[in-house]
Amino acid sequence: MGERKGQNKYYPPDFNPEKHGSLNRYHNSHPLRERARKLSQGILVIRFEMPYNIWCDGCKNHIGMGVRYNAEKKKVGNYYTTPIYRFRMKCHLCVNYIEMQTDPANCDYVIVSGASRKEERWDMEDNEQVLTTEHEKKEKLETDAMFRLEHGEADRSTLKKALPTLSHIQEAQNAWKDDFALNSMLRRHFREKKKAMQEEEEKDQALQAKASLAIPLVPESEDDRRLAALLRLHTLDSYEDKQRMKRTEIIHRSWFPSAQGPSASSSKASSVLKKLCQGRRPPPSSTGTVGDLGIVRRKSRDVPESPQCAADNSLSEEQRRPPGTTQGSKTLEEAAEASRTSKTSESKRNCSDQAFPLGSSQEDLLNPNTPNASLVADYSDSESE
């Protein structure tokens, strides 16, 4: 039934084909409906598409190529036998009207009023495009032999100039002639690239898992490699490496202690002795006196030097005497006498320190409670038998 819809029309009883001719005349209508409302004036409303970019003169807005309008179309002239049509339309952004018409001579559209064209045209000859041959030139080529000969020479010179380009195009076409080989090469290239991408993705995932990174990694570049080569990373040794280094150091260490200098050993020994003497000094005790113990202190004021101290003093004086000195030199004698006097006093002090230990006196020695005390008896008043 679908193919009969266009034919099944209702004809009223008063319809007379001789009088009305058609149903459109009977209903006083047109098949194009509203688009033919100005058909009596020779104007037909059509859908016009903008052929190029323009600027509206009313609102100064840009109207792009391909925008469609309801335009009034009418015939305004002929170019030879080709009619020239004019289109009038209203801008959709303002109340301005734009008029354009065809240009059969140049195969183009011309703006009559209401807009200005965005100039994007170029010369076909400068663009090395194929130019259309005009009608007069065609007639001249057919009738004038000399003009045809000159035109042939110009064509041959143009061919010589275009020969390298044509040969390059031909080589490119021959290179892409074998479809199967090209398809195989392209698929092989895609497989290699896909494999490389998978390996790179696995490396990135391993690095992200090792460093606990949640950010995506970008592919490295040549600048990144050059910058990384200039840097030196010093990683911290692990606990096992430190233990291994300590054991290696212990193994290669000498079994015997290194010998220290005499000055260091003597200073260390003297400091230890002073600490011991200070620690052994007891607090003074008030219990007991010398009379209670029955001990009489020696009446002599000077403490006699021990034989060892006297020998040391004489030996030190002989060593300090410079060799080759004469008895008659007063300067050397005075210097030796001064040094001898100072050294003698120092030796006496040392001997007294030996008689009375460090931190002790005669009273401390007479005190029996002290650890360094010693009993001294005086028998000068007793009669020898």
From Swiss-Prot:
Pfam family membership, one: Saf4_Yju2
Domain of life: Eukaryota
Gene Ontology CC: nucleus
Residues with PTM Phosphoserine: S40, S306
This protein's record includes keyword Phosphoprotein: yes
Subcellular location(s) per record: Nucleus
Polar residues bias spans: 359-373
Coiled coil stretches, renumbered: 182-214
UniProt-annotated stretches for the region Disordered: 1-26, 257-385
Keywords: Coiled coil, Nucleus, Phosphoprotein
Function: May be involved in mRNA splicing.
Family assignment from sequence similarity: Belongs to the CWC16 family.
Name of the protein in question: Probable splicing factor YJU2B
